[in-house]
Amino acid sequence: MNGTEGPYFYVPMVNTSGIVRSPYEYPQYYLVNPAAYARLGAYMFLLILVGFPINFLTLYVTIEHKKLRTPLNYILLNLAVADLFMVFGGFTTTMYTSMHGYFVLGRLGCNIEGFFATLGGEIALWSLVVLAIERWVVVCKPISNFRFGENHAIMGLAFTWLMALACAAPPLVGWSRYIPEGMQCSCGIDYYTRAEGFNNESFVIYMFVCHFTVPLMVVFFCYGRLLCAVKEAAAAQQESETTQRAEREVTRMVIMMVVAFLVCWLPYASVAWWIFTHQGSEFGPVFMTIPAFFAKSSSIYNPMIYICLNKQFRHCMITTLCCGKNPFEEEEGASTASKTEASSVSSSSVSPA
């Protein structure tokens, strides 16, 4: 084995020299240069500095503007709440432990950090799935005379929390476990060992099938059907320039959604799966650290893509930031009037508001 396994930890270094120490008790500077921990802490501080304001602003603006408090926007609020879970439950903890060079908060802290980081990430992931399904149902109308209402939105929210807990809670009760990973200053699911009594193998397979592959397939299916629906609508009005513009906007939006989903989660999932299927193989601490912390940046991508590109929300946000007056209101109003013909396509396909 090209690593050192101990009680509730796995350090990716062979302990031939005897320098490997528990990541709960000693700095791990023998793994990487201490400057790397400083850079990691600075990166987490940047995510907090950007992620908290943009997600908090999302909640505040929605509460302040009644027209944003619609069933279709509930899932976007859920997305912001999930991102705040990651900011407070994961990012602050990781920044603090990075400053010390090891997981100074101990085993209990590892469970708490791993749980909240996983919970926030899974809520965000399943929120995107529910959003994709909602867009598909509203735009493509597979169910005739269906109207998306408040009860459907609440059921969607409950579903995201149920699925997130189904992934984040089992390691707390003995089905797998949370251990320090990468540079040993943040915690995640144990992909690394086959420790007796934890059934890591079955949990990792369950997680990859139910909490990655299935969501990815659903997102691709729903947005693929949405693109087809928009193209069909545009083909029926080929003489309309505004409709063609709406088609391009929706195409760009969907591509950004899918690419962001893959950019955030595919590297982490791929590396985790490789480690799981090649347990005992040699890999460095940075090998898992980079994709893990890149996935955390989804707390910034999510509100920017799914909310800030919403024209109605952007209008309300500018109004809030400018103390009740939108200096671009007249310009946006004229632009909106010129796009009346395409509103049925763009409002139902691009913007969830």
UniProtKB/Swiss-Prot annotation:
CDD domains given in the database record: 7tmA_MWS_opsin (cd15080)
Listed GO CC annotations: membrane; photoreceptor disc membrane; plasma membrane
Residues with attached carbohydrate: 2, 15, 200
Topological domains, Extracellular: 1-36, 97-110, 174-202, 275-286
InterPro entries with a match to the protein in the record: GPCR_opsins, GPCR_Rhodpsn, GPCR_Rhodpsn_7TM, Opsin, Retinal_BS, Rhodopsin, Rhodopsin_N
Modified-residue entries (N6-(retinylidene)lysine), positions: 296
Transmembrane domains' residue ranges: 37-61, 74-96, 111-133, 153-173, 203-224, 253-274, 287-308
Membrane topology: Multi-pass membrane protein
Site residues, Plays an important role in the conformation switch to the active conformation: 113
Disulfide bonds: 110-187
Low complexity bias locations: 334-353
Statement: the UniProt record of this protein carries the keyword Cell membrane: no
Annotated family: Belongs to the G-protein coupled receptor 1 family. Opsin subfamily.
Protein name: Rhodopsin
Species, as recorded: Sarpa salpa
Lineage per the UniProt record: Eukaryota, Metazoa, Chordata, Craniata, Vertebrata
